[in-house]
Amino acid sequence: MSAAQVSSSRRQSCYLCDLPRMPWAMIWDFSEPVCRGCVNYEGADRIEFVIETARQLKRAHGCFQDGRSPGPPPPVGVKTVALSAKEAAAAAAAAQQQQQQQQQQQQQQQQQPQQLNHVDGSTKPAVLPAPSGLERYGLSAAAAAAAAAAAAVEQRSRFEYPPPPVSLGSSSHAARLPNGLGGPNGFPKPAPEEGPPELNRQSPNSSSAATSVASRRGTHSGLVTGLPNPGGGGGPQLTVPPNLLPQTLLNGPASAAVLPPPHGLGGSRGPPTPAPPGAPGGPACLGGPPGVSATVSSAPSSTSSTVAEVGVGAAGKRPGSVSSTDQERELKEKQRNAEALAELSESLRNRAEEWANKPKMVRDTLLTLAGCTPYEVRFKKDHSLLGRVFAFDAVSKPGMDYELKLFIEYPTGSGNVYSSASGVAKQMYQDCMKDFGRGLSSGFKYLEYEKKHGSGDWRLLGDLLPEAVRFFKEGVPGADMLPQPYLDASCPMLPTALVSLSRAPSAPPGTGALPPAAPTGRGAAASLRKRKASPEPPDSAESALKLGEEQQRQQWMANQSEALKLTMSAGGFAAPGHAAGGPPPPPPPLGPHSNRTTPPESAPQNGPSPMAALMSVADTLGTAHSPKDGSSVHSTTASARRNSSSPVSPASVPGQRRLASRNGDLNLQVAPPPPSAHPGMDQVHPQNIPDSPMANSGPLCCTICHERLEDTHFVQCPSVPSHKFCFPCSRESIKAQGATGEVYCPSGEKCPLVGSNVPWAFMQGEIATILAGDVKVKKERDP
C-alpha cells in the first residue's frame, strides 16, 4: 500500500463540508464528526444546531444527491434515526416509479439494433446511464429512489427563487435555494458588517458537552420538538436543543412554530406579518427592508397558517424578553436612586442637632470623616470606574448600635447616589464584568480611595474604614490614612444639590439664603416616582418642564457663584465665626444639578459668568498661613490678578482642591467670594495650600523654614509633591534621625511610596550628597 493510500485511508470526512480531513483536524465532541474549520466558522455554540439542520436536510433530500461521499460511519453509541411513516411512503413511491422507468429503458434498448464497437453519443445516457454517487456506495433502493426524485426536483428548481409551493400530493421534498440549502435553516453566510444570529449564547464547552452526550445516548430528552421541516413540507419535524434557541422561542407559546432567523436577517422589530389566505404555506421572508419580521408558517395548506415572529433588531439587538429585563433593571435603578436621595435629604436636614446628640465617639468619627470629603474612589478591578465619597452619617436601629453610612456618587458628576459601599461596588462590578447576577459581600474590599489627588497613592477603603470603625468601636486611623479633600473643577457641585429638586426657588444671588428643606423619607421617593409615572397630558408636561427650568435658572446664578464655599461647608468645615469644637452647620444644597457647569440655554446673560465666579473665589485663596510659625507666603500672580482689571486667562485658574494641613487638623475655614460681592463678610485664609498651581506659580519655598529655595537644588519628597525642603533643613533632619539607619521624609512623616504602604526613605548616596556641604548656586530672582 502506497503512502498516498495510507494517508487517504486515515482521512475522515467532515459531516458538514464532506471534505477529507486528517484525524488531528477533526473534532469528536459533537453528535457528528466535524472539522475544525466548520466549527470555527459556525461557532461552537451553534455547531450542534447546524449539524441537526444538515441531518434533516440530508434526510429530506435523500442523502447526498450531489454525488458526495456519505461521510464516516457514526461513532460508537450513536443510533440512527428511523424514517417517519410519511417519509417511508414517499420513498417507496419514488422507488416504484424509478423501477418502471428502468423497465421502459430496457425495453427501448432491446428494440434498438445493437452496434458493435460504437455507441452513439445521443443514446449514451439512455443506453448506459452514468452511475450516481448513491450506487457507488450500495445504498438501499428506497434511498436511491428518493435521491433520484430529489435530484429531479432540484434540477427544476435549483435556480428558482423564491421556491415554488409544494402540494400535498407530491413529494415532500422542498425546493432548494440557490446555495443548495433549503429553508431559513440553511444559514446563508452573513456579511462582514452584519452581526451573528440572536441565539442564546452559552459556554461552548457546556453546550457542546450536553448535546453530544444526549446524542450519543440515542435519546432526545430535553430537546425542543415540534419545529417544522426546513422545507416547509410534511417531512420530519426539527429537533433542536433548548440551549441553542433564543429566549423568545423558549418563553413563547408551545403552539407557535418558530425558527431562528438566518444570519443575514436585519431590521427592527415589527408587528407579525401573517401569510395571506391564498399564499400556500406562507413562505419565510428571508430578505427585505428593515422592519420586516421573519415569519414562518407551520402548515403548508392554504386554509390555515400559524405565524410567529422572530424579532431581531438591526445591529444585533436583544430579544424582547431581554429588553424587558433591561427596562425593569432601569426602573429599579431609578427607584433606588430616589430612595438614596431621600436618605441623603433626611441626613442633611437636621445634621447639626442630630450629630450633637450622638455619643462622643460617633460625633468625633463623623466630624473627622466629614472633614475629608469629597474624595475619589475607584473600583479595584477596573481603575477607570471612578466615584466620589461626599457625605457620612450614623444610623441606628432600635436596640442596635450605631453604624456608619456613607454616600457615594458614581459615576463622578452623574448625580447617581449610593448609600452603601456594597451598592456602588456591585454596580461597578456589573459595569466592568457585565454580570448582573452576582452580588458582592463587602464593598469595602473592592473600593480604593486616593489619599491625595494626583499622587497615585490609592489605598483600600476597608483599611480606612474597618469594621470596628464602621460600628464606632474604635476611632478613625491616624492622619496618615485620611484622604485629603479634592473637588473636581469639571463638576464642582456635589450630589447634595439633588435633594433640592422639590424645593422652592432660592433667594436672589448674593443673599446666601437657603431654600426650605425637601420632603424626607418615603415621601420624597414617592413624590419622585409619582412625578415620573403620572400620565399627564402633553400640555401640562410642557408647562411643568418650563417651570422646572425656570427654577433652575433662578438657582443657577447663586449656586455657581457660591459653589466652592457651599461644597466646603457641605464637607463639614467650620464656617467663619463658627466654633471649631462644635458640630458643623448643616450643609446647604448646591442646586438642582450637580454636573451643570454652564447656564441653561435660556439663562439670563446679564449676571456674572460662572468662570468669573470661580476665579473670584479662587483668588481669595492666594494667601496661605503657615501652621508652624505664621510667616505668610504670598502668591504674586494672585495679588497681581486682584490688583489689575485685566481679564484672567483660564490657564491661570487653580484646580479646585481643598487640602488638609500636615498636622491632621481638619478644621479648615472657608474663603468666601470677594468683599465686593459680599460686603459684610471678612476674608478668611485656609491653613495651607501647598501644591496648588497658584502657589507653584510663585517662588519655591521650603516647607519647614519657608525660605526661598534654590532654583535647581532642593530636596523633593517623591510621595507628596508639596514636601519641598532646602539642604540645611534636610541636613538637620538627617542628623536628627540618624544617618546610619532609615532616614525618612524631613517633614517628620513616613510618606508612603506610590502604590504601596512602604514609606519613602533616603538612599545612602542621597544622604552623603546632602551632608557633603552647602552647594553654592544662585537663588531664584524675585519676580
From Swiss-Prot:
Residues 94-115, 203-215, 291-308, 509-527, 635-654 have a biased composition (Low complexity). GO terms for biological process: development of secondary female sexual characteristics; negative regulation of transcription by RNA polymerase II; nervous system development; positive regulation of transcription by RNA polymerase II; protein ubiquitination; regulation of transcription by RNA polymerase II. Residues 271-280, 582-591 have a biased composition (Pro residues). Residues 594-608 have a biased composition (Polar residues). Pathway: Protein modification; protein ubiquitination. Expressed in the regions of the hypothalamus involved in reproductive control, such as medial preoptic area, arcuate nucleus and ventromedial nucleus. One of its GO terms (cellular component) is nucleus. The modification Phosphoserine is found at residues 69, 203, 506, 534, 626, 644-646, 649. There is a cross-link at residue 79 (Glycyl lysine isopeptide (Lys-Gly) (interchain with G-Cter in SUMO2)). A zinc finger (RING-type) spans 702-749. Keywords: Coiled coil, Isopeptide bond, Metal-binding, Nucleus, Phosphoprotein, Transferase, Ubl conjugation, Zinc, Zinc-finger. Residues 94-131, 162-331, 502-544, 572-692 are annotated as: Disordered. Residues 85-112, 323-358 form a coiled coil. It comes from the Eukaryota. One of its GO terms (molecular function) is ubiquitin protein ligase activity. Pfam families: IRF-2BP1_2, IRF-2BP1_2_M, zf-C3HC4_IRF-2BP1_2. The keyword Ubl conjugation applies. InterPro entries: I2BP1/2_C3HC4-RING_sf, Interferon_reg_fac2-bd1_2_Znf. It is found in: Nucleus. Probable E3 ubiquitin protein ligase involved in the proteasome-mediated ubiquitin-dependent degradation of target proteins. Through the degradation of CTNNB1, functions downstream of FOXF2 to negatively regulate the Wnt signaling pathway. Probably plays a role in the development of the central nervous system and in neuronal maintenance. Also acts as a transcriptional regulator of genes controlling female reproductive function. May play a role in gene transcription by transactivating GNRH1 promoter and repressing PENK promoter. Belongs to the IRF2BP family. Interacts with CTNNB1. PANTHER family: E3 UBIQUITIN-PROTEIN LIGASE IRF2BPL-RELATED, MYELIN TRANSCRIPTION FACTOR 1-RELATED. This is Probable E3 ubiquitin-protein ligase IRF2BPL. It comes from Rattus norvegicus. The lineage of its organism: Eukaryota, Metazoa, Chordata, Craniata, Vertebrata.
